[in-house]
């Protein structure tokens, strides 16, 4: 923290005494020893002829973006809570959740058990349509204490919640694994979800958005899951959850789908029902299948509704650190936000040295950070990808239209009036690229594979 403040004041001082306008630059090179290198360049162009141009159009505004982050799963909360003492945890949380660190401003909670919890559990274990014994006791162990610590550091963090499964007694399988929601349980399940939101509200925790079902097209997993067709989700939202949530007085917004980009017709068909659509804020997507352009297709069909990117995990199946940083920034962050997403969420915030604790699900998923049982913290590629966004893009920034084919990138204007461009250069040779934003221009020499975040006024 002290070093960050000294650097900031030094840069301000230098700018004052020289009178130069500067561009703040954060650079990551394929050489993993050069990660998030902070430097400045002059806000001017070189006399040489530069053929490649990226133009940012400050008057062509798109969506307001809320932030990036990852899920505080039960496993993530556990490793934060149990593997770090309070002093080291506070230090890590300030790195993760403040602008002086990597600027995480969005997280996701699991409503009950998921593939990253210790066991199968719900908040109402015995069949009871009155939900008299509803309790979030399991969440008091790790999730709620950790979430409260995070909120104390970043009170404005956005929170999404997603259920993996209703209680087993509400399902045709009689288990949290597999099956469908029983038709006679649509109403009580809506009550169950609202009770969850109310229980968190009583703890002083506002949940801003809630998806209806995590990965509704994957009902055959060995961990908590449920198959839910688009028609079933439409009926559940239109006739049960939507009316009940509206009547509850809660401000939580409903996000439908919450699955892969290979089936944009799922959310499009639900929102084709005007009543169901009236209860919905937008659609959520993962990118384990399909193309990120699916978000653009949904926006074209329903331009009045929002888009969210709700989950993506890295893991042992993609071990190339440098390639992962480039993919996350260029394909996922820039790709999703250029297709109107208001956020980007990765999967686990943290896991231990054994990629867990886990619950019959992914055996080699990685967190944004690894927090080992001995308290050692390791930063994964996801950490650096989030950093390239969070260090420069403020909450409630507005995406701007930009053009140029030399880079994978996305542009923003921050609430303080500064401009941002995130860029991934896939070229194999060093290349100078010129940036133009209204009457402002500057040049930057990209090295092969470089990931860069620019910020200027």
Placement of each model-derived feature along the sequence:
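Bacterial Sec-dependent N-terminal signal peptides
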Residues: 1-21
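N-terminal catalytic cores of secreted or lumenal carbohydrate-active enzymes
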Residues: 36-207, 239
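Conserved, mostly hydrophobic/aromatic
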Residues: 70, 103, 159, 210, ...
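Active-site neighborhood of glycoside hydrolase catalytic domains
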Residues: 188-209, 216-317
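Aromatic/acidic polysaccharide-binding cleft in carbohydrate-active enzymes
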Residues: 306-385, 402
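Glycan-recognition and catalytic regions of carbohydrate-active enzymes
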Residues: 370-417
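Carbohydrate-binding surface patches
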Residues: 391, 402-438, 449
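C-terminal beta-strand-rich structural cap/linker in extracellular carbohydrate-active enzymes
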Residues: 445-457
């Amino acid at each position: 923290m002290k070093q960050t403040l000294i650097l900031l004041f030094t840069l301000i001082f230098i700018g004052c005494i020289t009178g130069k306008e500067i561009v703040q630059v954060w650079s990551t090179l394929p050489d993993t020893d050069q990660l998030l290198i902070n430097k400045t360049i002059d806000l001017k162009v070189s006399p040489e002829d530069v053929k490649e141009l990226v133009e940012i159009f400050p008057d062509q505004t798109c969506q307001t973006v809320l932030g990036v982050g990852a899920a505080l799963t039960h496993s993530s909360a556990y490793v934060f809570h149990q593997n770090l003492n309070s002093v080291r945890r506070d230090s890590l949380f300030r790195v993760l959740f403040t602008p002086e660190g990597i600027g995480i401003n969005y997280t996701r909670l699991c409503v009950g058990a998921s593939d990253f919890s210790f066991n199968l559990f719900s908040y109402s274990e015995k069949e009871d349509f009155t939900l008299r014994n509803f309790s979030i006791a399991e969440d008091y162990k790790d999730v709620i204490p950790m979430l409260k610590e995070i909120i104390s550091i970043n009170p404005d963090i956005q929170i999404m919640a997603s259920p993996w499964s209703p209680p087993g007694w509400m399902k045709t399988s009689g288990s949290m694994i597999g099956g469908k929601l029983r038709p006679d349980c649509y109403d009580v399940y809506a009550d169950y979800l609202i009770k969850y939101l109310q229980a968190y509200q009583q703890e002083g925790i506002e949940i801003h958005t809630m998806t209806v079902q995590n990965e509704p097209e994957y009902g055959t997993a060995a961990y908590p899951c449920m198959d839910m067709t688009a028609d079933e989700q439409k009926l559940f939202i239109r006739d049960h959850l939507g009316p009940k949530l509206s009547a509850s007085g809660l401000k939580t917004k409903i996000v439908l789908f919450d699955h892969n980009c290979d089936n944009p017709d799922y959310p499009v068909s639900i929102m084709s029902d005007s009543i169901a659509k009236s209860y919905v804020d937008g659609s959520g997507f993962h990118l384990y299948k399909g193309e990120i352009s699916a978000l653009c297709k949904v926006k074209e069909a329903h331009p009045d509704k929002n888009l969210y990117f709700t989950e993506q995990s890295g893991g042992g199946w993609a071990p190339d650190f440098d390639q992962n940083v480039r993919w996350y920034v260029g394909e996922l962050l820039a790709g999703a936000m250029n297709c109107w997403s208001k956020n980007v969420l990765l999967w686990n915030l943290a896991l231990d040295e054994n990629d867990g604790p886990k619950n019959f699900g992914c055996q080699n998923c990685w967190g944004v950070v690894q927090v080992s049982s001995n308290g050692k913290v390791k930063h994964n590629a996801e950490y650096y990808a989030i950093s390239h966004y969070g260090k420069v893009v403020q909450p409630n920034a507005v995406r701007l239209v930009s053009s140029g084919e030399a880079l994978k990138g996305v542009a923003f204007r921050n609430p303080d009036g500064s401009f941002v461009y995130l860029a991934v250069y896939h070229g194999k040779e060093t290349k100078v690229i010129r940036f133009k934003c209204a009457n402002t221009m500057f040049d930057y020499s990209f090295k092969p594979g470089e990931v860069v975040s620019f910020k200027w006024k």
